[in-house]
Amino acid sequence: MPKQFENVTAVAKANIYFDGRVISHTIIDSTGAKHTLGLIYPGEYHFGTAAAEIMELVAGACRVKLAGQTDWTDYAAGQTFNIPADSSFDIVITEGIVEYACSYV
């Protein structure tokens, strides 16, 4: 995933979840693909997915447990994880504020 997105359309209205503890902005790239750039503040959260997602951590660290799994996996800045469509995952922030880029595939 690129560190910088060129030639995008940015949606000004933020996506705000969990009383402002998770915030993202949607961008649409030149191919029409949707991405979100966001922040996840310390805490534990559960998310559902409609489309498949690729999450890349830009800063911070977390633990993730995908639906149907019993084990948690640790991720840090520069690492990615994939979430299937029509699924869910749990995430616990373990270091700092997680900054992320999410691509919908």
Where are these regions (language model features)?
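A short, N-terminal "cap"/entry segment at the start of jelly-roll beta-barrel domains
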Residues: 1-33
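Conserved short histidine dyad/triad with adjacent acidic residue
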Residues: 28-50, 80-85
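Ligand-binding loop in jelly-roll beta-barrel domains
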Residues: 84-105
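Short acidic-glycine-tyrosine-enriched beta hairpin
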Residues: 69-86
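Short, conserved beta-strand element in jelly-roll/cupin
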Residues: 49-64
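A structural signal for the main folded, soluble domain(s) of proteins
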Residues: 46, 66-71, 92
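Short hydrophobic/aromatic-rich beta-strand segments that constitute the beta-sheet cores
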Residues: 47, 64, 100-102
